[in-house]
Amino acid sequence: MEQGPQDGEPIEIKIIKEAYKKAFVFVNKGLNTDELGQKEEAKNYYKQGIGHLLRGISISSTDPEYTGPEWESARQMQQKMKETLQNVRTRLEILEKGLATSLRNDLQEVPKLYPEFPPKDMSEKSPEPQSLSSLPQHSEVNGSTSTASAESSSTPTTLSLPCQSHPSEAPPAYTPQAAEGHYTVSYGTESGEFSSVGENFYRNHSQPPPLETLGLDADELILIPNGVQIFFVNPAGEVSAPSYPGYLRIVRFLDNSLDTFLNRPPGFLQVCDWLYPLVPDRSPVLKCTVGAYMFPDTMLQASGCFVGVVLSSELPEDDRELFEDLLRQMSDLRLQTNWDRAEGENEFQIPGISGSASDQLKEASGTDVRQLDPSSKDVRQKGKRGKKTKGTSSEEVNLSHIVPCEPVSEEKAKELPEWSEKVAHNILSGASWVSWGLVKGAEFTGKAIQKGASKLRERIQPEEKPVEVSPAVTKGLYMAKQATGGAAKVSQFLVDGVCTVANCVGKELAPHVKKHGSKLVPESLKKDRNGKSTLDGAMVVAASSVQGFSTVWQGLECAAKCIVNNVSAETVQTVRYKYGHTAGEATHNAVDSAINVGVTAYNIDNIGIKAMVKKTAKQTGHTLLEDYKIIDNSKGENPGGGASANLKGEKDEQKEGPEKNGAKKKDK
């Protein structure tokens, strides 16, 4: 294995690093030219990148003597180069066959105003329009229609009259039957408007472009193939009709180092032909109370334009939750505070024109958001802006109902059975009584120990000459006390760390356990005959049992500490009285060392894997029962000042107990 002349780095690692660097330079150049539509130049860059990738992969790095962090990094580079080589070869094969186009060409390809259909037979041709005099009137109507479909632009487009030498390019006349060269797309009836072309016609125009066209590092986080509509709001408050249901997807770029170089955001949201860049904590998104998501329209240069995204009520709940979770992670998602619908309002009012929603979004849209591409701002398929009709199909998605966003502060009151509340209050009250009794019993026990020790000292005759303890023994006991005290602190620190990790893991697991666990419970256990939740009642009793056990456990802990402190203090004082001050100090160090050893042993027992699993499971259960805790407001019944179901309050009460006991000792 050859070594580098300067820094001692193996020459093989240098070759791998150089090939890695040059390969990705050419691959990135190929991606840029590929996105710009320069296919031939992109293929040349891809081929050069493949050459460097093959060179870097050809170096052997699996020999046993190739060990260390440098070789591990080199192997990771080679693994990444292998994955990139496979993707580049796939893309190059697509380019050479001419089977794919770039994302920009897909989005800039504006469909024709009218769909193309095979010509009819001569026998079925509809009659010619009555006269060309109707064309100016019809063009004026179509002109206003096209202007309404592009309401976000500041300058309305005018529809010029077609040349009479090309009658097939003329817009259809409003005749009872379709004019020559045109086809009836939909027709109205008494029960509504029906489509005459079927669902497949619309679905073929709403398929997402291939993911390969976005680059080698594009990762599709979510794809909703159908059931998503968008509408547009211009600065004047005019709202377009919702588009025909289409697809939605969120794409993230894995290689963040290329974002600045390629002038692209970390990810983007795509709904049919509309794109929105997603930058964490910078891209404003407003979720309205009616369930629609409002975005600033960054594809237009005009300010004050917004886009609303509406999800179908028939979409799976998992897709809806995943979409909102991704928006929280990749944008600045905010919830609308309040929006009241007018009384007697039957039609769905787009929240983009309401004062509160519009103001909130305008305020948030002041953030500078990077665009996907400067030249793609005006790219839009105008044909999808208007609402298209659809036929009665078995796969039809119902978009008439929108899932509203319920306020977070309003919680549904649980209807609990009476027996559950009674049992829960009895458990809490009994636990408080037991805890109070333990603490009081420990206090009386401490007083009895002090009284007995004082009587014992009255009967003991002190030694005339104090017992001399060897300095080596005294120093050894003192060092043992210091060592065991340090071990106790370290073990306690480790236990606290384990508890912290277990608490975090338990809190993260609790929502998933609660969500999937409820599916396993039979419906017969969820509701009783009176419509009250039997399961919630059982959960309330379980939560109260956990709270009661915690209360009793804290009382036991407080009582044990009180008794141990009293026994230790009286033992040291008795030895000091009998054998002198030196022997008393040695006894004090020995007793403290014994206590520290016991505490350390207890802490070590709570650090193992089993203890970690137990604490995680226990914290998961506590978090699950958090919503079912109750508060016992009967202050007169509890001798300790009220049985509170809040564990934090009980901890504070138990902490105050030892402080009061300590104050009594000092007074004595």
UniProtKB/Swiss-Prot annotation:
Subcellular location per the Swiss-Prot or TrEMBL entry:
Cytoplasm; Midbody; Lipid droplet
- Keyword Ubl conjugation among record annotations: yes
Annotated MIT domain residues: 16-94
The biased composition feature labelled Basic and acidic residues covers: 118-127, 648-668
What are the start and end residues of every segment in region (Required for localization to lipid droplets)?
A: 431-503
Q: State the residue spans of region: Disordered.
A: 110-176, 348-396, 631-668
User: Cross-referenced SMART domains, in alphabetical order?
Assistant: MIT (SM00745)
Which GO molecular function annotation, any one, does this entry have? lipid binding
Residues spanned by motif LC3-interacting region (LIR): 193-200
Q: Name one GO cellular component term.
A: cytoplasm
Q: Where is this cross-link: Glycyl lysine isopeptide (Lys-Gly) (interchain with G-Cter in ubiquitin)?
A: 362
Q: Which residues carry this modification: Phosphoserine?
A: 126, 470
**Region (Ubiquitin-binding region (UBR) domain) location:** 190-380
Q: How is it modified after translation?
A: Ubiquitinated; ubiquitination does not require ITCH and WWP1.
Gene3D superfamilies attached here?
Phosphotransferase system, lactose/cellobiose-type IIA subunit (1.20.58.80)
Quaternary state and interactors: Interacts with ITCH and WWP1. Interacts (via MIT domain) with IST1; leading to the recruitment of SPART to midbodies. Interacts with MAP1LC3A and MAP1LC3C.
State what this protein does. Answer: Lipophagy receptor that plays an important role in lipid droplet (LD) turnover in motor neurons. Localizes to LDs and interacts with components of the autophagy machinery, such as MAP1LC3A/C proteins to deliver LDs to autophagosomes for degradation via lipophagy. Lipid transfer protein required for lipid droplet degradation, including by lipophagy. Can bind and transfer all lipid species found in lipid droplets, from phospholipids to triglycerides and sterol esters but the direction of lipid transfer by spartin and its cargos are unknown.
* Domain statement: The senescence domain is required and sufficient for lipid transfer.
Its recorded name reads Spartin
Q: Which organism encodes this protein? A: Bos taurus (Bovine)
Q: What is the lineage of its organism?
A: Eukaryota, Metazoa, Chordata, Craniata, Vertebrata
